[in-house]
Amino acid sequence: AELDLPISLHEEDPEFIIRPGVNQGKVAEQLEYGGASATAEDVMVARDCILALHTGASVCIQHISSGNSVEIVRTAKKLGADVHAEATPHHFTLTEDAVLKYGTNARMNPPLRTEEDRIKIIEGIKDGTIDMIVTDHAPHSDEEKARPLENAPSGIRGLETSLALGIKSLVEPGHISLMKLMELMSKNPAEFYRMIPGSITKGAAADLVIFGEKELWTVRKEDFASKASNSPFIGWELPGKIYYTISSGKIVYQR
């Protein structure tokens, strides 16, 4: 708090993790994997929310995955703590069942959890408990992800699919408006990290994404910007086709 700097925290206590990347639940039991319990996240979130409350520090709970952790953050905010929280598109779109379908491309830290957790994350987004949507972009090679589940690295790529999944999972079902999604993905993260949020005004630097909200596109491995293709969303048809990405006035992506 004395330094007036934001603190971002990945919340997992290894003491409550048998094996990372998969939720400790029905899928881990089926695979005899062990898994990472929601308790591993919940105890760390509770600790850091209490510390934020007592110190006045500005804290961000990164890529929240547990419904109980959402409730802990909600309570901390009501008590006056300067606590913020992120959610990723994969955590509000998929559940632990994705591991059975997508294998290592659904292994991540913190892991995908239950449908109840997914719904609680969406509720947290709707009521403002979760105020940022981020990618937790973690590219890995095909060779790395081809390893057995227990030996493969955790994480998926998220840059190309984040906007589309936000539209599909949050806007189209009516949970939030498109403008609210833009705020969660751009304005709020910029403000938390003491950056100047972009604005569409005369003379301002053009930092823009031009897209068709309802235009469909198919996620294809060959369209990813890097060599990594570790995504469970390959083959999905999604809304929000992007035509241009403009950074500091320069076109850096064009379909």
Regions found by a protein language model. Name each.
Residues A1-I133:
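Histidine/acidic residue-rich metal-binding segments in metalloenzymes
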Residues D13, S66, P89, P139, ...:
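Short, glycine/acidic-enriched loop or turn micro-motifs at the edges of active sites
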Residues L79-A81, I167, Y244:
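Generic alpha-helical hydrophobic packing signal
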